């Protein structure tokens, strides 16, 4: 749960995000969110690559995933948030920093023609940077993972995160703020060439 006193995104006096179904029980909201997002991610997996790996692409993924749940879907947060005493990027700099980061990705030719080792290294870098940015009030991890899944697909890889336990990935993601080595190792293990995956 994010730390943000008197959040404009929550029902007054609670940590429950204002949602389109007006669900005020946090467990019920989490369960509803999980079921909806599962279907949305499945739909995206059938669509292939849905953008040009720019800001618009990243934002559109968040909007698609969360538009049936939260009114802020596809909108950058307008308050600062923290988790476990770590404060994510200040909201005023989100858009400019995301533009800078994805321009850097473009300058790297979207990681084309890299060895698997180098691809995993650069993928872990972008995962870590997007994590620090945390552009949205909720749904950052799922948006980032889908964005990087599509980036992997563009480069001929299937990014199968089910190969590593969610807890290991979470711990590596947290640690990636200062060291991406574990995240890089896990992402390498999760990457398979599309042709090999297809014929299994």
What do these predicted regions represent?
Residues 1-200:
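FIC/Doc superfamily catalytic core
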